[in-house]
Structures are given as C-alpha cells and as structure tokens.
Amino acid sequence: AEKLNADVEVVVIASLLHDIARIDGLNENHHIEGAQYAEKLLNSLGYDSEKISLIKDCILSHRGSTGIPQKTIEAKCLASADAMAHFRSIPDMFYFVYKDLGCDIEEGKEKIRKKFSESYSKMIPEAKAMVEEKYIAVMKVLE
C-alpha cells in the first residue's frame, strides 16, 4: 500500500475487517455484511466519514468472484493482499482439499490449481511479482 501511495490506514483497517462477517458464518455475502458492520463500528467510534466510505468500498470489492470492481488503489491493495494470503499457507490448502474435503488426487489437484490461478489472476502486477515464484512452484507440483 505504501509503495503504491495508497492510504495505508484505510488498507490496514479494511484488511482487519474485510472478513469480519464470517464470524457469524456468513460466507456467501460476507463482503456485503462486513462492509455494513465496518460502517456501524467505525461510525460508533467517530471515525472520518470519507475514510469509512473508502474502507467500505475496499471490503465490498475484495472478492474477485462478485464482479464488484475495485475502484481505488486501496481496494486493489486489499484484494491483492487477500489473494496473496493463499500463497503464505500453501500446505494448508493441500490439507484442506485432501483431508477436510476428502478429494481424490486429480480432483484435489484441479481444486488447488483453480484456487491459486484465480488468486493470482486477481492481483495487481506488484503483488503478482511478490508471489510469482511460489505460483510457478505450485503449478509445477500440480502438473
């Protein structure tokens, strides 16, 4: 965020709150519920309304699967950081797919390949550069 001249405070707060609705088990619309929760919380703390708007935009648009465009550099930073998190926990993804989901080898490979491909494709170029080696390595393992 800093390297891209984004408002670091907005990105940090959005990153802390972007998945907050998952606590209540809301996965499908957690971006919508999370943005509403963030607005209520930050308003109750007397936070600046312009920054609240930016934070809500970040949270609403952080999921690539929703089709909600990331209009600000802060939103792009959050979406990229969210996608990058998968590359910090590669073994966890394998465990989840094979142990928790019980996938067979080929089905699991396809799920993992798809997840990492989607994550990589939604990143801004600066983020891609940071995880490129891991992305290439995961794809080689899955060949």
How would you describe each model-predicted region?
Residues A1-N5, L17, S65-E143:
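Divalent metal-dependent phosphate-bond-processing catalytic cores, especially two-metal-ion Mg2+/Mn2+ enzymes
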Residues I32-E39, K56, K109, R113:
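An amphipathic alpha-helix signature
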